[in-house]
Amino acid sequence: MTKVQYKHTEIAVKKKLGQNFLTDRNTIRKIVQSAEIQPGDHVVEIGPGFGALTSAILEVCPSFTAVEKDRKLADFIREEYPSVNLVESDILEVDFAKLAEEGPVKVMGNIPYSITSPILFKLLENRSHIISETLMMQHEVALRLAANPGTKEYGILAVQLQTFCDVRYLFKVGKKVFRPRPEVDSAVVRIVPKKTPLDDCETEFRRFVRLAFQQRRKTLQNNLKQHYDISQLSASELQRRAESFTITEFEMLFSRIRPLQ
């Protein structure tokens, strides 16, 4: 069992919580700068751990909220950083409307590899309460999130997130700056929610995207014909694969199909 100790607190690292603690001050500084936070901003940090990012945020924002699931780490943050509003909870269960009672929030954090996608979709569903997200995640996931059409990384995650948010890959973070050292590299991504006409039909659009990509090597026609009336789509569109369509094209396709009854 791997253990990590900092000051007076020692924890047994929980793989299921994705506990890899950032130690490099330069990387921490770059993350805070990338988040573009200002004094008075409402900041929410996901998984503060031993407070490496927490202390850097406090240099800009004298008070903010952090969400930590691990009880020992939550106690550590309360003791070391009393000005931080510590919410001891699973981020997937947090009420973002409550976190944003005083105004929309800027989300930051080194998010666990094991639940990256659920966290991203939790944030997506609560984007009306969010100004921006500056997140460190597994490098491979970051590439998928910011991928362009026609690449092997481009898929459901990219289309669903990029439709409702502006997504930017910022920089890579090597595994050597963590304790314990993970098996893969990380990267920092910035996500900014945007207004779109699809806000009112998000659930059905996301279902459409999942079905379009359900078998990547099949054509759009083969993936959709059992689920939608696709008679308004052209023959050339139907013979293309989902990975070839841009975000704008996906939006146009969605406006011209109808679910089969």
Swiss-Prot record:
Query: So where does this one cross the membrane?
Result: none
Any keyword S-adenosyl-L-methionine? yes
Chief place where the protein resides: cytoplasm
Q: Which reaction does it catalyse?
A: adenosine(1518)/adenosine(1519) in 16S rRNA + 4 S-adenosyl-L-methionine = N(6)-dimethyladenosine(1518)/N(6)-dimethyladenosine(1519) in 16S rRNA + 4 S-adenosyl-L-homocysteine + 4 H(+)
Q: Which GO terms describe its cellular component?
A: cytosol
Q: Which residues does the record give as S-adenosyl-L-methionine binding sites? A: N20, L22, G47, E68, D90, N110
Pfam family for this entry, one: RrnaAD
Q: Which domain of life is it from?
A: Bacteria
Keywords annotated in UniProt: Cytoplasm, Methyltransferase, RNA-binding, rRNA processing, S-adenosyl-L-methionine, Transferase
What are the subcellular locations of this protein? Answer: Cytoplasm
What InterPro entries does the record tag this protein with?
A: KsgA/Erm (IPR001737), rRNA_Ade_diMease-like_C (IPR023165), rRNA_Ade_Mease_Trfase_CS (IPR020596), rRNA_Ade_methylase_Trfase_N (IPR020598), rRNA_adenine_dimethylase (IPR011530), SAM-dependent_MTases_sf (IPR029063)
Which NCBIfam families did the record assign?
Answer: ksgA (TIGR00755)
**Function statement:** Specifically dimethylates two adjacent adenosines (A1518 and A1519) in the loop of a conserved hairpin near the 3'-end of 16S rRNA in the 30S particle. May play a critical role in biogenesis of 30S subunits.
Similarity field: Belongs to the class I-like SAM-binding methyltransferase superfamily. rRNA adenine N(6)-methyltransferase family. RsmA subfamily.
What protein name is recorded for this chain? Answer: Ribosomal RNA small subunit methyltransferase A
The gene from which this protein is expressed is: rsmA
